[in-house]
Amino acid sequence: MSATGEETYKLLEETSKTPEGRIYKLPQDYQHIKQKYFYSRENLVMMLKSLPEEEKAVIFVSSGEDLLKMKEIFGDTAAYYCSDNNPKYGKRFNELTECVKDRELQKRYFFTTKAFGIGTEIKDRTVKHLYIDQWKPTDIIQSAGRKRPLDVDDTCTVYFRDYDADWY
């Protein structure tokens, strides 16, 4: 199952037809996302520091370099994850289990590259904010899909980086 597997499914269908009884489709539901905003990169730190104390945030950054910058600013108040396979930054940050344990964030802020999005979910009622610094539609879908609601009252706000705003 995948929220972003359309291209793969098309390729598979072109090479060999899948029997009807073996195709399963589940609806994508983003009802838990109550509000959506755009942010400029220069405002990110101010926005994060102004969040209510009891609320947590997942921040999907573009690179290991971004993780280093955020670590300079937020220090031990946040967790930082980059794939171990990243040759330049892989071993410089937290292990995934130090960031997310039993599907809950271990720190108020969790900065990560999109590597976190592969096969991982967050079921944490205190995660109320997702900041997505991605521009590819499939990456955005994967990032937004990491937060899984526990019930209808478990909602969040998603902030998409406005790349045009960074030019001003």
Locate the predicted segments by residue.
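C-terminal helicase lobe and adjacent C-terminal extensions/tails of nucleic-acid helicase motors
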Residues: 152-168
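Conserved helicase motor
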Residues: 62-65, 79-96, 113-117
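Conserved SF2 helicase motif VI
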Residues: 133-157
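Conserved two-lobed SF2 helicase motor
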Residues: 103-119
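Conserved strand-helix element at the start of the C-terminal RecA-like helicase core
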Residues: 47-74
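A short beta-strand-to-loop transition that corresponds to the Sensor-1 phosphate-sensing loop
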Residues: 1-6, 61-64, 111-115, 162
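A short beta-strand element within the Helicase C-terminal
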Residues: 111, 120-133, 156-158
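Interdomain hinge/linker at the junction between the two RecA-like core domains of SF2 helicases
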Residues: 2-50
